Amino acid sequence: MLISSKNLLLTAREGGFAIPHFNFWDEMSAHAHVAAAEKKNVPILLAWAQKHEADIDIDEALILGKFYGAHAKVPIVLHLDHGFSPDLVKYGI
């Protein structure tokens, strides 16, 4: 299930736990991170970084992240604003 980072961070603060953050760079890595989160029954930040742009652009990352996040059995935050280009960071937000 996709949720907002604000909601997850508030829940983590109240529950006293940290949230793992994993970068994905293709479909297999996105799937693996979500599958591991489900196996451990923990929420995660599923993130794309601009350094992976040669392998997967931000629009493809959005499609993959939304798909795997929407089908996940645990809370997933899709995080697409890790970059060095201000325009890309704004687009990712």
Annotate each language-model stretch with its function:
Residues 38, 42-53:
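Short, well-structured secondary-structure segments
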Residues 12, 33, 37, 91-92:
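Generic structural signal for hydrophobic
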Residues 21-35:
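N-terminal glycine-rich phosphate/pyrophosphate-binding loops that anchor nucleotide-derived ligands
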Residues 18-23, 44-48, 76-82:
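Hydrophobic faces of well-ordered beta-strands that scaffold small-molecule active sites
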Residues 7, 52-93:
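N-terminal active-site wall of soluble small-molecule enzyme domains
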Residues 1-20:
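N-terminal amphipathic alpha-helix/helix-capping segment at the start of soluble metabolic enzymes
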